[in-house]
């Protein structure tokens, strides 16, 4: 069995490619079923966020090309598009990659906590849809344990910084009097909730939350002291917003160039600052062509995020050390489990020899033979049968100068304690 991790992320692919490869929430269960139905794929899980799409599989062979081809077919993409951006890892390197992702070490914002929650959702989806077997189940559980250890034992999670924080930080640098600005947030998920809290902490004046379901918008608005509206009310609210930050799971853009042009006229062309965190994008790229609009995507937040990365370099080094220890533990346990089948077959062989010797001894006792002689014969028979096969193979190994086998046999077959007692 081979463990495979394959995907693209913000370091290997542009936002245009990432949004083409992203799975919508409605697609995930079906995609997982398709992936697991591929020949040789025994277990599978799918992670899809604004910054990465990754597939984790247990396969009969390496299988990375088959999985990559499937990813392209699912999204109707030419092979060369993915070939230029995709990466893959096998076995120990795949496990290391997953643990680094879970700990936030592979994120755009170093140490950001949201990815662990997103990984847990991917794990739960795979579990609910029969995607997991023993191998991925154990790997994910161990990964979550290592990620928790990283967060509790290093400074990687201190002063939480995320894409949400980076967006608010950029906005606060652009507006001289942030306390007089008004913000419109589109979406009501975890990222927008973080944006709302960061905006409140930064002293934003007015805050409006728009969401497809008004009830969810009202729930978040109540928590952050904001106004709640539906998506249908955005055209009216847009004219009053200085800052617009959007992060939904919509497959189609929510803000178009015409809608924003209309809002600018009502604002008498006062500038609008927009950050589109969504993948696929919520704001049409043509909106950025308007003179009074400053439109940023998640990729544009890199400068703010890079400063954060420098501040967390020491914590990251500590985290890498913990992950390395976690990898070694996982590999040890995997090797132990790998010997399980060999141990089972060896014990079954020994049990078969014991049963045969016992059957013969009972038959001899039933015929009235001397019990002491029967026991002596039984012990000799068991000893000879148990040692016959290994003895032959040791002689063959010696004749072929297979010193590796002889050395392993010495470790496996000779009990040092027994040898010491014999010499005494």
UniProtKB/Swiss-Prot annotation:
Reaction(s) catalysed (UniProt annotation): (S)-4-amino-5-oxopentanoate + tRNA(Glu) + NADP(+) = L-glutamyl-tRNA(Glu) + NADPH + H(+)
SUPFAM superfamilies, alphabetized: Glutamyl tRNA-reductase catalytic, N-terminal domain (SSF69742), Glutamyl tRNA-reductase dimerization domain (SSF69075), NAD(P)-binding Rossmann-fold domains (SSF51735)
Pfam families: GlutR_dimer (PF00745), GlutR_N (PF05201), Shikimate_DH (PF01488)
Annotated organism of origin: Chromohalobacter salexigens (strain ATCC BAA-138 / DSM 3043 / CIP 106854 / NCIMB 13768 / 1H11)
Keyword NADP: yes
Record's miscellaneous remark: During catalysis, the active site Cys acts as a nucleophile attacking the alpha-carbonyl group of tRNA-bound glutamate with the formation of a thioester intermediate between enzyme and glutamate, and the concomitant release of tRNA(Glu). The thioester intermediate is finally reduced by direct hydride transfer from NADPH, to form the product GSA.
Keyword Transferase: no
Active site as annotated: 50 (nucleophile)
Protein name stated in the entry: Glutamyl-tRNA reductase
Top-level taxonomic group: Bacteria
Binding site for NADP(+): 187-192
GO molecular function: glutamyl-tRNA reductase activity; NADP binding
EC number: 1.2.1.70
Alphabetical keyword list: NADP, Oxidoreductase, Porphyrin biosynthesis
Gene3D superfamilies documented for this protein: Glutamyl-tRNA reductase, N-terminal domain, NAD(P)-binding Rossmann-like Domain
Family statement: Belongs to the glutamyl-tRNA reductase family.
Alphabetized InterPro entries for the sequence: 4pyrrol_synth_GluRdtase (IPR000343), 4pyrrol_synth_GluRdtase_dimer (IPR015896), 4pyrrol_synth_GluRdtase_N (IPR015895), GluRdtase_CS (IPR018214), GluRdtase_dimer_dom_sf (IPR036453), GluRdtase_N_sf (IPR036343), NAD(P)-bd_dom_sf (IPR036291), Shikm_DH/Glu-tRNA_Rdtase (IPR006151)
GO process annotations (BP): protoporphyrinogen IX biosynthetic process from glutamate
Chain's role: Catalyzes the NADPH-dependent reduction of glutamyl-tRNA(Glu) to glutamate 1-semialdehyde (GSA).
Domain comment quoted from the record: Possesses an unusual extended V-shaped dimeric structure with each monomer consisting of three distinct domains arranged along a curved 'spinal' alpha-helix. The N-terminal catalytic domain specifically recognizes the glutamate moiety of the substrate. The second domain is the NADPH-binding domain, and the third C-terminal domain is responsible for dimerization.
Coiled coil: none
């Amino acid at each position: 069995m081979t463990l495979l991790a394959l995907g693209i992320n913000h370091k290997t692919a542009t936002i245009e490619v990432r949004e083409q490869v992203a799975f919508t929430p409605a697609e995930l269960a079906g995609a997982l079923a398709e992936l697991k139905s591929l020949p040789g794929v025994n277990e599978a899980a799918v992670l899809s966020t604004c910054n990465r799409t990754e597939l984790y599989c247990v396969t009969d062979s390496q299988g990375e090309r088959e999985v990559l081809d499937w990813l392209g077919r699912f999204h109707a993409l030419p092979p060369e598009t993915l070939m230029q951006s995709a990466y893959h890892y096998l076995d120990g390197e795949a496990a290391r990659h997953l643990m680094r992702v879970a700990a936030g070490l592979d994120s755009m914002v170093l140490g950001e906590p949201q990815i662990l929650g997103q990984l847990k959702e991917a794990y739960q989806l795979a579990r609910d849809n029969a995607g997991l077997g023993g191998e991925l189940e154990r790997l994910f559980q161990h990964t979550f344990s290592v990620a928790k250890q990283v967060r509790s034992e290093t400074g990687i999670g201190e002063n939480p910084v995320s894409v949400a924080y980076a967006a608010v930080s950029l906005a606060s640098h652009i507006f001289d009097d942030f306390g007089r600005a008004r913000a419109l947030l589109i979406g009501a998920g975890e990222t927008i909730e973080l944006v709302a809290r960061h905006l409140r902490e930064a002293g934003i004046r007015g805050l409006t939350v728009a969401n497809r379901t008004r009830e969810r918008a009202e729930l978040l608005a109540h928590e952050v002291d904001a106004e709640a509206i539906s998506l249908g009310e955005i055209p009216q609210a847009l004219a009053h917003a200085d800052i617009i930050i959007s992060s939904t799971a919509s497959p189609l853009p929510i803000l178009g160039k015409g809608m924003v042009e209309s809002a600018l006229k009502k604002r008498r062309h006062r500038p609008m600052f927009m950050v589109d965190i969504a993948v696929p994008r919520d704001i049409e790229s043509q909106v950025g062509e308007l003179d009074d609009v400053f439109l940023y995507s998640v990729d544009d937040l890199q400068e703010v995020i890079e400063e954060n990365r420098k501040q967390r370099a020491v914590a990251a080094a500590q985290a890498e050390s913990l992950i390395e220890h976690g990898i070694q533990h996982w590999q040890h346990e995997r090797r132990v489990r790998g010997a399980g089948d060999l141990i089972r077959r060896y014990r079954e062989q020994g049990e078969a020899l014991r049963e045969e010797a016992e059957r013969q001894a009972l038959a001899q006792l039933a015929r009235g033979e001397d019990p002491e002689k029967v026991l002596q014969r039984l012990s000799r028979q068991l000893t000879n049968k148990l040692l016959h096969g290994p003895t032959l193979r040791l002689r063959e190994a010696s004749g072929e100068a297979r010193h590796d086998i002889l050395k392993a046999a010495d470790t496996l077959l000779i009990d040092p304690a027994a040898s010491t007692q014999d010499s005494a």
